[in-house]
């Protein structure tokens, strides 16, 4: 906000995205450019700014549920991290705030959690939706629970980053009457990909609950 002299960056990109950059950003009199990169267990933000004296920067990147944030530095010095304590949060979002100096580099270290990458389904204008939907995710102890919607009779394969932290996968489906049926063999995890096989049923989308048991 220009009135508060604060710039906020809250990236929530898929974990497998390449570096993201913003050029010639402007808020009030301040101008800035930034590059955000993410590796397996680190994330780096570099921001260059001009005419930004008195401006603060808020950095809130999103990581998969179960990610353990270790530490953050700004230009080599420790940077305070504030945790996002919302009980219904769909991601881990550490919050860091600092004054802009003209050239700032923030480095964040963490222990990564498994993150699911939805399959890319090419579509043309007018095509009916056929892609898998991730409605929500929750973490209960060591159980990462994924609420999915997919077409009855379809099989979907999802990439799982940091799959070495997953021990097993189980699945259940909800029928048209809202009753849940356990079908543990409908979800298969091979260490890198998760395959979910929706049983045959009526036309349209059905609901599945997949549980990834973490090590």
Annotate each PLM feature.
Residues 210-212:
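Charged, long alpha-helical assembly modules
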Residues 1-184, 193, 202-205, 214:
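Non-catalytic C-terminal accessory modules of carbohydrate-active enzymes
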